[in-house]
UniProtKB/Swiss-Prot annotation:
GO terms under cellular component: cytosol
Provenance organism: Clostridium tetani (strain Massachusetts / E88)
Domain notes from UniProt: The IMP cyclohydrolase activity resides in the N-terminal region.
Top-level taxonomy: Bacteria, Bacillati, Bacillota, Clostridia, Eubacteriales
Protein name: Bifunctional purine biosynthesis protein PurH
One Pfam family linked to the record: AICARFT_IMPCHas
Pathway involvement of the protein, from the record: Purine metabolism; IMP biosynthesis via de novo pathway; 5-formamido-1-(5-phospho-D-ribosyl)imidazole-4-carboxamide from 5-amino-1-(5-phospho-D-ribosyl)imidazole-4-carboxamide (10-formyl THF route): step 1/1; Purine metabolism; IMP biosynthesis via de novo pathway; IMP from 5-formamido-1-(5-phospho-D-ribosyl)imidazole-4-carboxamide: step 1/1
Family indicated by similarity: Belongs to the PurH family.
BP GO terms, sorted: 'de novo' IMP biosynthetic process
Signal peptide start-end: none
Example of a GO MF term: IMP cyclohydrolase activity
EC number: 2.1.2.3, 3.5.4.10
């Protein structure tokens, strides 16, 4: 039976209606600070917590509920005679429900606050109360999520009590929230990429229909401590996004984000099948399409500019799963919405991932994101690349790092006409890419050449320039082969393995 409730919330959403429901059901309400004023101003009968503690708020509100009169009422086990005799002796009344949500520490990260200002959003009293209530969940109902108000209200109307399983679930939500909250504070204060204990503060955005395959379950979570592209994207049309859609969108968006020029990326099964730069958006799309007109079918297309009417007309000529771009003009959106299942995504934030996380059995691997920029290009051959070849080399290297190793990309006119990856040896990747991209000019490799066979094969297909990290004990063999065949080659010193 719920007789007394303590309410202290930063987020006032729905609290007035819930408090009025409790009042109607003869529940005594105790409250603090701004919540007390909000309820009182809206004609809810409420006691200020200082009336219970006989102790005023102090230290600018830092100490309000940290008092035995509050925590004794929460933590007392009702069927423990000693506990109940103790609180009776101390004139402490039991508290049966605790409704608390916390200062918005998550929301204030990255908003330009000083250290002192951010620290003021570290909640102390709230976490202490909800942890206490969660520990004693058999006797105390604890609510931290405004979405639960209606459900609990319906439960009380129907049964006049909250059952054990619901109490346990609500308690579990407390510790789930606190692990994320404390993790965010720890990350903020430590400022370490690899702390001794790793806590990830993510919140579920939505359950997904299934994972990579229909027999796998899945959900999508977003970071509570970092902003980024996929925190605020907007779906303007089409079916719900799937697990595979979101994974593919991530890679495609990162690829077009590599370029200042107008760029388009076509992607399938997490691998680019066409990437191009154009003078116009339509040209960039047509060039990307020409890279692999077969694989683009049923894929994802990303742009780094607003989609216009002319480009939209071309896009709807084939079956695509997703289109992602910073924006769409009115005519373009109308055309794309003509395909009711086509997912049209608006995303105007650049990718901001700083770390990558990979799950392995009973552990995770964490590494910094591969954001290395080419700073020095060492021409190691007698022949020097032309300015145009150098531009194509840089373009090719930006693409190849997103292709699963072993990866080879061949390019002509800033168009990735041959992309091959996921091969267990480099020559196989080279053969596939060159076969697809006959008459290309530049070849890029994600890692060094262990032998000179890639150079030999490249020369057969008319490649004029090669860019690769270098670093093989047989680099000399590849350099000599390039010199013999009249090919220029550049070493970057930066490897781009992708597993």
């Amino acid at each position: 039976m719920i007789k007394r409730a303590l309410i202290s919330v930063y987020n006032k959403e729905g609290i007035l209606e819930f408090a009025k429901f409790l009042e109607k059901n003869h529940v005594e309400i105790i409250s603090t600070g701004g919540t007390y004023k909000h309820l009182k101003d809206n004609c809810v009968r409420v006691k200020e917590v200082s009336q219970i503690t006989n102790f005023d708020e102090i230290l600018d509100g830092r100490v309000k509920t940290l008092h035995p009169a509050v925590h004794g009422g929460i933590l007392a086990i009702r069927d423990n005679k000693e506990h109940m005799d103790t609180i009776k002796d101390k004139n402490i009344e039991p508290i049966d429900m605790v409704i608390v949500n916390l200062y918005p520490f998550f929301e204030k990260i990255g908003k330009g606050l000083s250290l002192e200002e951010q620290i003021e959003f570290i909640d102390i009293g709230g976490p202490t109360m909800i942890r206490a209530a969660a520990k004693n969940f058999k006797d105390v109902v604890v609510i931290t999520d405004p979405k639960d108000y209606k459900r609990i209200e319906e439960k009380l109307e129907k049964e006049d009590e909250i059952d054990f399983n619901n109490r346990k679930t609500l308690a579990g939500k407390v510790f789930n929230l606190m692990s994320a909250y404390d993790g965010a504070i720890s990350k903020f204060l430590l400022e370490e990429e690899y702390p001794e204990y790793l806590s990830l503060s993510y919140k579920k955005g939505k359950d997904l229909r299934y994972g990579e395959n229909p027999h796998q379950t899945a959900a999508f979570y977003t970071s509570l401590t970092e902003d980024g592209a996929f925190k605020d994207f907007e779906k303007l049309n089409g079916k719900e996004l799937s697990y595979n859609n979101i994974k593919d969108m991530d890679v495609a968006w990162k690829i077009v984000g590599e370029f200042e020029e107008i760029a388009c990326c076509a992607l399938k099964h997490n691998s680019p099948c066409g990437v191009a730069i154009g003078d116009t958006l339509l040209e960039s799309y047509k060039k990307a399409y020409e890279c692999d007109p077969i694989s683009i079918f049923g894929g994802i297309v990303a742009f780094n500019r607003k989609v216009n009417k002319e480009t939209a007309k071309e896009l709807v000529k084939i079956f695509l799963e997703v289109i992602i771009a910073p924006d769409y003009d009115e005519d373009a959106l109308r055309i794309l919405k003509g395909k009711k299942n086509l997912r049209v995504i608006k995303c105007n934030t650049k990718p901001l991932d700083k770390m990558e996380i990979c799950k392995v059995d009973v552990g995770i691997l964490v590494q910094s994101t591969d954001n290395a920029l080419i700073k020095d290009m060492d021409v190691v051959t007698a022949k020097k690349p032309t300015e145009e070849e150098m531009e194509n080399m840089i373009f090719a290297m930006k693409v190849v790092k997103y292709v699963k190793s072993n990866a080879i990309v061949v390019v002509k006119d800033k168009k990735a006409v041959g992309i091959a990856g996921g091969q267990v040896n480099r020559i196989w990747a080279a053969c596939q890419a060159l076969e697809r991209g006959n008459n290309s000019v530049v070849l890029a490799s994600d890692a060094f050449f262990p032998f000179d066979d890639v150079v030999k094969k490249a020369s057969e297909y008319g490649i004029k320039a090669i860019i690769q990290p270098g670093g093989s004990i047989r680099d000399k063999d590849s350099i000599e082969e390039c010199d013999e065949k009249g090919i220029s080659m550049v070493f970057t010193g930066i490897r781009h393995f992708k597993h």
